[in-house]
Every structure is written in C-alpha cells, then in structure tokens.
Amino acid sequence: MKYFAEMINSLNFDRVFVVDPHSSVVAATIKNCNVINTNIFVSNVLDMLIHDGITPIMFFPDEGAMKRYSKGIKIPYAFGVKKREWGTGRILGLDVMGIKPEDIKGRDILIRDDICSKGGTFYYAAKKLKEMGARNIYLFVSHCEKSIYDGQFGDDKMNLLTVDYEKKSIFGTTQHRKLIDHVFTTDSIYPFKSDENVTVFAMNVDYAENVCDCGCGCHCKEDK
C-alpha cells in the first residue's frame, strides 16, 4: 500500500476518490483523499426489498464490519464471529452474535461487507443463518471480484451464486434452495453487467463529485 500511495501522490492530483477502502490506512497515506462510502446503494437495496414487502435483518460477517457499517441503520442487526483453522487461517465456520436465535427464524437477511472474492466468508455466514431458520438471504458488497464464480462450496463444489441449501421437510422430503438469493454490488471492479444472480450499481462522476470535502463519504453537497 505504501508504494502504491507514493505512486499516486507523485501525480499530484487535486482530489483522489477511494470507494469504501478495506483499511483506514488508505486515507492516511494518499494525499487529497476523499473516501466514498456506499451507504446510498445499501439504502437502494433496502428500498427495493421493503417495496417487495421484505424488512430484513442486517448481518455483518465480523465485528469489524459491524463497527464500520452499523452506525445509523434503523433495522435490527447481528454480526458473525469466524472460526478459523489454526495455522492456515482457513475459515471453518461462523457463529452468530448480537441477536437471539429465535429472532432469525423465518426472517430475511441482508449481509453487508466491503469485498467478495471467492465468497468463503459469505458461504459460511449464509449456511449458519439458514441452519438457524433464516428465509431468503441477500448480499451487498461494495466490491465484487470475478472470482465469485470460482469458489467451490458444498458437496457438489458449486460457487457462491449456485450452491444449494438442503433442508429436510416435516414429511421427510428434501427441499433445495439457493444459499444466497441475490448479490448486490457496484461496478468498482465487477467486470460484467447485472444478471439474474447479481445487480450491479454504477459508480459515476456525479456521485463522486457530490461527496463533501471532509472525506467522510457523506453527500452534504447535494443539500447546498
């Protein structure tokens, strides 16, 4: 990051827009940096869901995401605690905290985080939430890599967008449902157009220009 920041700084830009960086170090090392959050897109997703009669619970995959994104939200939320393999750091599972298990049952969930690569974090989060009785699960990430199609999960080694969740009914039959019902993201790095599995919101110049000079990602200029 240090050398990347030095390269950008050497170009002497008047303003540098950075969308929802994974680390706060970015804003500290890049000169004239304006951090843009993606709250407006999350609000759009919530509006879409509420319009369809869905009032979801917000879920953050870890405590860090909760601290970054929970401020000001007006719906119930919970967060995850990842269980990792000692030595490799590989994710083995996830526990849900901050909400009673019975409050998950039958509810729709919107998972929010900054980036999705192959989707292991979201696979284990969604799997745990489904086991707790969650109904539909949606995912919003600010940045989505093409490798979301490469992750191999479940017995059939399917990717995050196609992997099934199997549930035995009271009659003994097996019900198959998608683990993640839909993904929402921006076109910050996502190379494709929206499809049946993914909705892509466009980042544009007007959006960036309306960010205030304080660098916090708010849009107070729109009110002036």
Whereabouts are the PLM-identified features?
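PRPP-associated nucleotide enzymes
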Residues: M1-K224
